[in-house]
Structure formats: structure tokens, C-alpha cells
Amino acid sequence: FYSKYGIESNGRIRYFNFQRNEELEEQVYKDIIGDDDREYVLYHDAHPGESNMEFDRHSDYRYIDLNGIVKNPFSLIKVLINAKEIHVVDSFWASVCFNIDAKYGLFNDVPIYLYPFKHHNRWGGILKDSTYIDEMNLPVKLTNWEVVCQTKI
């Protein structure tokens, strides 16, 4: 969606900036994670059926849906940093996580799996759809990110 507003792909990271509020992050972490000491996996698939998001679920892990979990996505930074894995459809959450990771490297130790939309010409925040999988031309390559596309259109 950046290109629709004339923002170059490298500008979306270069000009991205926010001030962390670690006190708020800690409170949100306690509210969401609490005393549960299990490792957890975060996921966001607000558009079921529009992507091929499938991943193995292990009984040892807790699974937390990011959809509507907070009003301020930056309050979730500590929760994101401490996740075992993050699975996101190409959505708002994918864009926020990518920009934070590309600019600040906060999620370097967290495997992040990006699922493009499967319908032709269905725009996401990073990719267009699974037919454009080879055209993911981002200014920063992040080794902890993997595009998961089970079937091409």
C-alpha cells in the first residue's frame, strides 16, 4: 500500500520511527502472557480462506491470535520479541513487524512466517499475492523471515 501513496520501498523503513514505552510493554506482556511459562506462538490470519496459512501446532506451546489483541501495536513489542515463532498473513501485522524488524532488528531471534494472499491481485502489505512470490523486492533482506506459499496460482 506504500506504493499507492508514492512512498518508495526503502522510505518505508528509513522514515519509520517510534519511541518504545517499556513500562507499557511490560504491562501488556503481563496481561497477555501472565504467569503461563509455556513458550508461545503468535499468529494473525484475519482473513481465513484468503491465504494458505497452515502450521503445525504443538501441545507444548500456547497459541495467541494477534487479531484485535491490542489497540496500540507498539505496546506488544515485548510479547513479539519473546515469541517462539510468528505466523502472519500479509496484513497490517506483517507490515508492522517487518518495519520494526528491518529498522531495529528487534525480532532477529524470532522465526517469522509470512503467508501471501492466494487470490489473484489481492494486495497485502508486503507482497501482492502468491503469483508475485518471486518479486518480493524489499530493501532489506531479513534472514529470520520466510515466505510460505504452499501453492502458486
Regions found by a protein language model. Give the residues of each.
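Catalytic machinery of carbohydrate-active enzymes
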Residues: 1-153
